[in-house]
Curated annotation (Swiss-Prot):
Keywords: Cytoplasm, Protein biosynthesis. This is Ribosome-recycling factor. The keyword Protein biosynthesis applies. GO terms for molecular function: ribosomal large subunit binding. It comes from Shewanella sp. (strain ANA-3).
Amino acid sequence: MIADIKKDAQERMGKCVEATKNQMAKVRTGRAHPSLLDSIQVSYYGTMTPLNQVANVGIEDARTLSVTVFDRSAIQAVEKAIMSSDLGLNPMSAGATLRIPLPALTEERRKDFIKVVRAEAEGGRVAIRNVRRDAISEVKKLEKAKECTEDDVRRFEDEVQKFTDAHIKKVDEILAAKEIELMEV
């Protein structure tokens, strides 16, 4: 029973780390990366559709993304969706392909992005700690039901704390890498 709780907690903490990593990937750096456009929704035949379902996003060079739209009739909708996103991008149309030059980030904008990334990291840490709290409370319920001993609870708390620290360290490493990436000119 305790082993199941521990395994579940580890899986949930791993998912928290992945979710934090994915959220940080959406924060724009000076480099072109297809995941920058993942959050964009396009009005395609009256329904909001993710951009990656109506177009192929690729990297042309370090500061340019290319978006190849599958259906030529949707080019205007894709262009409008990219322009109206809060990313500050201006696509240039070239047939069925949109070229999106990424403007260089100002120092002020970089610092704003670092604040956003730090907030994401803190959110990840809090989520990991919440998983730890939930796991420990489940084991304490088992102790009250006389299904495990107080020593088992203490041992479990120590083990959970160790892998909580390990997962928080992973989040901190991801944060440090993202901060370095953001400060590169």
